[in-house]
Structures are given as structure tokens and as C-alpha cells.
């Protein structure tokens, strides 16, 4: 293609051509900044042929993508430039695309010699295969901190994501707090409407209940009123909840304040009190990852396919996604090593255990010729007690010496540190209520490790994500099990509430019977000595308990507890389904805690929960437990090509 000599155009020259294509044909309105940017693009890339067919074709492509990505009616300069850069990058990728045609004829590729039946001369028939894009997996392998993750605004009315117009901050205003819970509500509500199993379910808003009779289904967030009575709250109002006789909320999940539930029952009014008598209650069902991605137009949630902080919502091309999936299956020797939590570097036994673990991995690497792992994930707390900075730093200095000793398996491997509650500077919150997401470890604390590993070390936030081709891996270090048990609401009847209050609620027992219903808490301590019996083959819990094969009462307390945790987190679509008092969240960064879409795998490192590996709605959730317990070091290895997890243990 001959080189193009750029020219300088004036917006007044470009306006008639742009109006004909953008406004008259596609109904778009070019703002002054958009016209200036378009003039510069066309003049620079098409020169004297700015009125030609190629320039018009480019403008048509811009209009098509602008409307396809639902970027609005008004075309402004910055998003227009980003969209043009995206088109240019896509064209370059397609030019590099390899066309592979394999013929059944021996020695022929893409060409078959065919002889006519009537003896006519042979002809060459060229069969073109669909091009596949060359994918270099390292370009789609990235560790994403919560504070670097692209953030979006959810437009509930149009049910689509848009780029945020304001920069997030840790010191957000009160409007961000209200928007945080409203966005959670709309995301789960729209997911509920998409579910095929709930297509016949008609959700009534709380405001619409007033003055109506009969049974209704309402959806909202569990909360408490000033009298500390349990209520349900949606975007229209709040109503007091009372459980009717025979009502047994789904026992397979927790019900913390701040979680979302569906209630079926009757609206009643006695004096000034308005109540909703609940007949059935349960959580919204989780949605498979691919279904969520398809519902929102194959969005690039993690910013792998362009500028993650640009003003354009990028979509992943199906052709690129298919090539990434093929590359993912081809790379069979890749693995991610995730160590258990509470890696106390101030404990000599921990360093001894790490030395033995590294020695085992190095021996396997040298003897069997296996590849180095993609990444090693170390989860806090990295100290057993609160320590001053200079003592805390000593632990990482000793870790750096270990890395030097085993440089053959450390060099070129992504090293990820996920902070815990006692790590700086989170340890300024001794009440176990630090604001999430937790910020990364200070660079000054691990400067020797950073110098040794260079760009391969990642001081990540908690939680953080790892993107690997089509997969999304989430790493979260928290005591979720303890917090869920502590914050689980006791769903008592109106009779118990009225004992402590003077304003009794009168209910006709002939119409609705009331009794005590309490969600019992499971045991709070577990023995980790037995290890994970089901880690290599994760148990699929997508099927409800009642329909699973075999008696459900044969499940151990550990299995019941682990299933409740997984279902609660996945059904809520959030890593912290609590109110702002039980678990404070940085309001502008709440999106980094979403599990919508569900990740490919969630490493939920909880040292107070039983070890488990469960699969729920095609999302694998793994808890490796503590790193060191009873002189046994534990870690897990994840194979992305097979999507399997293998438990490893080593006696110290």
C-alpha cells in the first residue's frame, strides 16, 4: 500500500462530509471536539484522498462501532480517538492473522487438484478457511490490583455498563455510598429477571404493596430499622418482615444484613405498623459466567484488549476469544501455585517449611522437566503479631534470601503478595474491620524482594485478580466464615419481637400463623489436620440440596459450612455482602468486590474455614486453608488448561 502524505484539513472542510455520514445516515451528532478529532484523523491517514471511498469507509466503521457499543448520540473527541485507535489495532491484528488451510490431498495445503469426470483439464480450487488471530499468551496474562482495575458505571435503566466520568477516590462523597447499594441491587435484580427458572416470578416493589391484598413476591436487601427489627429494603422503600408459621428460609445460605433475598408472602397493616408476613424466603440464584458476559455484550471487564482507563467500553471479538480459548487448551503445562494463608515470616518454622516446599518444586522441575509455574501467590498475614516496620521488614529480607537460594524456580515467575489484616498499613485497624479493598504492601517493606524479582513481583491489593487468556482468577484473603456466622441474622417471629417492645403487632392467626424460626449457626471451629479430601475433583453444588443424590444428612459439618459460604458469596455476587458497619468498603471501589460475572476460579483464602474445593454454577471456589498447620505445609496447584486443582502437602 503506497504511503499517504498527510495534509492539514480545517473542520469547516470536513463538516459537510461528516454530516452526510454521521448525522444524516446514522443519526449521530458530532460535537465540536469530535469534528476536530475526526478532521485530524482523516487528514493524517488519508491525505488528499480525504473525500475518497476509503475515508468514507472508515467513517462508516466508526459510526457502526459507536452505535454497536451504545456510546450515545453525541460524538466527542476523546472517545472518538480511542475508538479509531481500537479499529486501527484490530486491522493490524487481522493483517497478521494466519490462514491455515489443510487439504486431504497429500502434499497440498489449501489447494486441491480436481479432475472433471468428463476428462476435462484439471483446475485448482482454493478453499479459504476462517482466519484465526495469532495469540501470544503473555499479552493476555496480567495481575490486576483493585486500584488499577477498570471501573464502570451501571446504567440500570438501559441495563448496560458505561465508563465512569469521574475518577474514583478513597474519600468519596455520600452520594457514592447510596449509589453503591443501589448498583448492587440493580445488578442482582436484573440477573434475577434473566434467570429462566424465575421467568414466571413477578416482583412487586415495596411501594406498590400499600393497600393491596393477596400474596406477593418482593426482592430487596436485608436491613434493620432504628428499633433493630429486620426489614427488607428496595429502591422504593422499606418494610418490616415477620416470618409466618412453617416458613423456613433456605438453610443453605447465610443471611447477613446487607444481603439480598426474595420473599413471598402477604402485606398486612395493624395500626401504624406495616409488615410483610413471609411465607417463603431464599437468595437470588447465581448466574453462569458466560451467560452474564453475553448479557452485557461480551465486555472487556479487565481491560486486556486496549487502554483499560480509556473512555470507551471495549468488547472482545468472538474471533479473538476463540483463538485465546484454543491457546489456553494448548498450553497444558501451565500452573498457578497458591500457598495457604497466614504465612508468618516471623516464625522460623514457616521459613523452614517454605525452604522444603521450594526444594520439592525445584526437584520436580529438574527431574521431570516440567515448566516453571506461571505464578506463586503468597497470602497474609505475613506476621503473627503486630510489629514495628523494621521488624516486619526483616521477614521479607529472609524471604529474599530464600528466593536467591532457589532462583532456578523463582526467576521469570510472577510473585504475588496479597496482604492480610495484620499487614501494613491495614494493622492500624485492630477491630478486624479494615476498609476493603486493602491496599498493597508498602514497597519499602519488600524492597529487597522487589530488586531481586524486578517486574515479576506484584504487590497486589486484597482482593486482586489475575487475567489469563479467557480466564479470570480472583484471590481474596479474609475471614469470611467467621464474619458470616457473626453477622447472620436471627430471623425471629413477631411474637419474640413484641416481648421487648410496647408497640405489639396484631396479626389474625386464622389467616397467618406466626412461630419462631431461627437459622442455626454451624460450629465455629474446624480441624484442618485431615486436609482436602475433595480438592482434585471439586464437588458441584449447583444442584439444590433436595435434588442431590443420596441423603443430605450424611454431609459433615465441614461440608455444610463450606457449601453455605460458597453459595452465599456466589448468589450475592459480591465478596463482602455485608452492611457498611460490619465490613466497611471504599465506596468508589465497591466494583472491585463484585463477582459479576462469576470468575473462572475464586481462591478464597480463609484460615478459619474448612478446606474445600467446590464448583457452583461453573465457578470453582477453593480454600487452601492455612499454610502451616500441625507441622504440615499446604498449597494448591491450579491447571488453567484443564481447570483442575491439585492439593499438595508436605510434612515439616
Swiss-Prot record:
InterPro entries, A to Z: DNA_pol_a/d/e_bsu (IPR007185), POLE2 (IPR016266)
Alphabetically ordered keywords of this record: DNA replication, DNA-binding, Nucleus
Gene Ontology BP, a term: DNA-templated DNA replication maintenance of fidelity
Subcellular location: Nucleus
Pfam families found in the cross-reference section: DNA_pol_E_B
Presence of keyword Nuclease: no
GO CC annotation: cytoplasm; epsilon DNA polymerase complex; nuclear replication fork
Residue ranges of coiled coil: none
UniProt entry tagged with the keyword DNA-binding: yes
Disulfide bridge positions per record: none
GO molecular function list: DNA polymerase processivity factor activity; DNA-directed DNA polymerase activity; double-stranded DNA binding; single-stranded DNA binding
Function: As accessory component of the DNA polymerase epsilon (DNA polymerase II) participates in chromosomal DNA replication.
Subunit and partners: Heterotetramer. Consists of four subunits: POL2, DPB2, DPB3 and DPB4.
Family: Belongs to the DNA polymerase epsilon subunit B family.
Note: In eukaryotes there are five DNA polymerases: alpha, beta, gamma, delta, and epsilon which are responsible for different reactions of DNA synthesis.
Stated name of the protein: DNA polymerase epsilon subunit B
Amino acid at each position: 500500500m503506497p504511503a499517504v502524505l498527510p495534509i492539514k484539513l480545517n473542520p469547516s472542510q470536513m463538516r459537510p462530509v461528516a454530516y452526510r455520514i454521521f448525522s444524516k445516515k446514522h443519526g449521530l451528532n458530532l460535537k465540536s471536539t469530535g469534528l476536530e478529532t475526526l478532521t485530524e484523523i482523516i487528514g493524517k491517514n488519508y491525505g488528499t484522498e480525504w473525500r475518497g471511498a476509503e475515508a468514507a469507509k472508515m467513517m462508516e466503521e466508526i459510526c457502526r462501532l459507536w452505535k454497536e457499543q451504545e456510546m450515545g448520540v453525541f460524538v466527542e473527541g476523546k472517545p472518538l480517538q480511542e475508538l479509531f485507535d481500537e479499529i486501527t489495532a484490530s486491522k493490524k491484528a487481522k493483517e497478521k492473522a494466519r490462514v491455515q488451510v489443510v487439504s486431504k490431498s497429500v502434499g497440498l495445503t489449501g489447494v486441491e487438484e480436481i479432475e472433471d469426470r468428463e476428462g476435462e483439464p484439471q483446475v485448482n480450487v482454493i478453499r479459504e478457511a476462517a482466519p484465526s488471530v495469532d495469540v501470544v499468551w503473555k499479552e493476555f496474562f496480567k495481575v490486576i490490583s483493585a486500584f488499577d482495575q477498570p471501573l464502570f458505571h451501571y446504567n440500570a435503566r438501559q441495563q448496560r455498563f458505561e465508563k465512569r466520568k469521574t475518577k474514583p477516590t478513597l474519600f468519596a462523597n455520600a452520594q457514592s455510598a447510596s449509589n453503591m447499594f443501589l448498583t448492587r441491587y440493580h445488578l442482582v435484580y436484573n440477573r434475577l429477571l434473566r434467570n429462566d427458572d424465575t421467568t414466571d416470578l413477578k416482583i412487586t416493589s415495596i411501594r406498590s404493596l400499600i393497600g393491596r391484598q393477596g400474596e406477593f413476591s418482593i426482592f430487596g436487601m436485608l436491613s434493620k430499622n432504628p428499633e433493630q427489627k429486620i426489614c427488607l429494603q428496595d429502591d422504593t422503600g422499606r418494610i418490616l418482615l415477620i416470618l409466618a408459621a412453617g416458613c423456613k428460609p433456605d438453610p443453605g445460605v447465610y443471611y447477613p444484613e446487607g444481603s439480598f433475598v426474595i420473599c413471598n408472602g402477604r402485606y398486612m397493616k395493624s395500626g401504624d405498623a406495616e409488615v410483610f408476613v413471609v411465607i417463603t424466603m431464599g437468595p437470588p440464584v447465581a448466574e453462569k459466567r458466560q451467560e452474564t458476559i453475553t448479557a452485557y455484550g461480551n465486555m472487556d471487564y479487565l481491560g486486556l484488549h486496549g487502554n483499560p482507563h480509556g473512555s470507551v467500553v471495549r468488547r472482545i471479538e468472538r474471533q479473538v476469544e476463540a483463538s485465546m480459548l484454543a491457546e489456553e487448551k494448548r498450553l497444558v503445562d501451565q500452573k498457578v501455585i497458591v500457598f495457604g494463608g497466614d504465612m508468618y515470616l516471623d516464625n522460623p518454622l514457616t521459613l523452614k517449611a517454605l525452604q522444603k516446599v521450594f526444594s520439592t518444586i525445584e526437584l520436580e522441575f529438574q527431574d521431570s522437566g516440567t515448566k516453571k509455574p506461571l505464578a506463586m501467590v503468597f497470602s497474609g498475614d505475613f506476621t503473627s503479631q503486630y510489629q514495628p516496620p523494621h521488624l516486619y521488614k526483616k521477614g521479607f529480607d529472609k524471604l529474599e534470601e530464600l528466593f536467591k537460594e532457589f532462583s532456578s524456580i523463582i526467576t521469570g515467575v510472577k510473585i504475588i503478595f496479597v496482604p492480610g489484616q495484620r499487614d501494613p498499613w491495614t494493622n492500624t485497624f485492630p477491630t478486624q474491620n479494615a476498609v476493603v479493598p486493602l491496599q498493597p504492601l508498602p514497597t519499602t517493606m519488600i524492597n529487597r524482594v522487589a530488586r531481586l524479582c524486578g517486574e515479576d513481583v506484584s504487590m497486589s491489593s486484597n482482593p486482586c485478580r489475575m487475567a489469563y487468556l479467557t480466564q479470570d482468577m480472583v484471590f481474596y484473603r479474609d475471614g469470611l466464615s467467621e464474619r458470616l456466622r457473626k453477622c447472620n441474622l436471627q430471623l425471629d417471629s413477631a411474637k419474640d419481637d413484641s416481648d421487648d417492645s410496647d408497640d405489639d403487632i396484631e396479626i389474625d392467626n386464622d389467616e397467618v400463623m406466626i412461630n419462631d424460626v431461627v437459622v442455626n449457626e454451624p460450629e465455629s471451629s474446624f480441624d484442618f489436620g485431615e486436609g482436602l479430601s475433595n480438592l482434585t475433583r471439586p464437588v458441584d453444588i449447583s444442584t439444590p440440596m433436595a435434588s442431590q443424590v443420596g441423603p443430605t444428612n450424611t454431609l459433615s459439618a465441614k461440608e455444610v459450612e463450606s457449601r453455605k459460604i460458597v453459595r452465599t458469596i456466589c448468589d450475592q455476587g459480591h465478596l463482602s455482602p455485608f452492611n457498611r458497619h460490619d465490613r466497611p468498603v471504599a465506596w468508589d471501589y465497591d466494583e472491585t468486590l463484585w463477582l459479576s460475572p462469576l470468575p473462572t476460579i475464586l481462591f478464597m483464602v480463609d484460615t478459619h474455614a474448612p478446606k474445600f474445593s467446590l464448583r457452583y454454577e461453573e465457578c470453582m471456589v477453593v480454600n487452601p486453608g492455612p499454610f502451616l498447620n500441625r507441622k504440615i505445609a499446604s498449597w494448591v496447584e491450579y491447571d488453567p488448561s484443564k481447570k483442575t486443582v491439585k492439593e499438595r502437602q508436605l510434612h515439616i
